Design a protein with these regions (language model features):
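Generic N-terminal segment detector
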Residues: 1-36, 148
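Divalent metal-coordination and catalytic microenvironments
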Residues: 8, 53, 82, 118, ...
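Histidine-centered catalytic micro-motifs
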Residues: 44-61, 157
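Active-site environment of divalent metal-dependent phosphoester hydrolases
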Residues: 57, 126-127, 159-166
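Structural signature of FAD isoalloxazine-binding scaffolds in flavoprotein oxidoreductases
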Residues: 61-78
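Glycine- and Gly-Pro-enriched alpha-helical subdomains that act as flexible
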Residues: 83-127, 133-137
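Charged helix-capping and loop-helix junction motifs
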Residues: 134-140, 167-170
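Conserved small/polar residues in nucleotide/adenosyl-binding loops
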Residues: 175-180
Length: 180
């Protein structure tokens, strides 16, 4: 079987939506050929939650590992891509991804186990501005992934928890502690 590397990273730029209150994506020219410098040089700054990112354990648990401490092997290798835009095209933008969805995916796999990495596509395009309308994962869905031995779940939305969640619905042990 031919293997390929698929880059799922969304494009980032000054129009990249950011979580309310987070600093925006900024590109600043720090040196310029036009101003007599030997080269154009830019500085880029943005929130750690901008674009594709991983929440390291230290995000919620001070004194634990940061993103640099996570093994690269966790993020590279075989994975299953679940395209909910095809599987559930009528789902509302803010509808939770439920256990039934994972059961339907497993049924399509003819008894094969889920791989250790799962990516979930929930929308057809990125909104031009921040939107709290996105498909988060239900706690039961996350527990099912845990039970199946899934070590990494990637989503194309800002969080696996709903934007208006006052507490994390998904088990914290899964979303943050299983990464190291």
């Amino acid at each position: 079987m031919k293997q390929s590397l698929i880059d799922i990273t969304p494009k980032m730029g000054v129009r990249t939506p950011v979580y309310p209150g987070d600093p925006p994506f900024v590109v600043r020219l720090t040196a310029s050929v036009a101003a007599g410098d030997p080269a154009d040089v830019s500085a880029v700054s943005f929130s750690a939650h901008c674009g594709a990112h991983v929440d390291a354990p230290a995000h919620l648990f001070p004194g634990t590992g940061d993103a640099a401490s996570l093994p690269l092997e966790r993020f590279v290798g075989p994975c299953l891509v679940i395209d909910l835009t095809e599987l559930e095209p009528e789902a509302a933008p803010s509808e939770l991804v439920r256990l039934q969805t994972i059961a339907a995916v497993k049924a399509l796999m003819d008894g094969k186990a889920l791989p250790s990495r799962v990516l979930i596509k929930t929308r057809r395009s990125q909104p031009p501005v921040w939107s709290s309308d996105f498909r988060a994962l239900s706690p039961e869905c996350v527990e099912a992934f845990l039970a199946e031995g899934v070590e990494l779940v990637g989503v194309d939305v800002p969080s696996i928890d709903p934007a208006d969640s006052e507490e994390l619905l998904a088990p914290v042990s899964y979303t943050h502690l299983t990464l190291p």
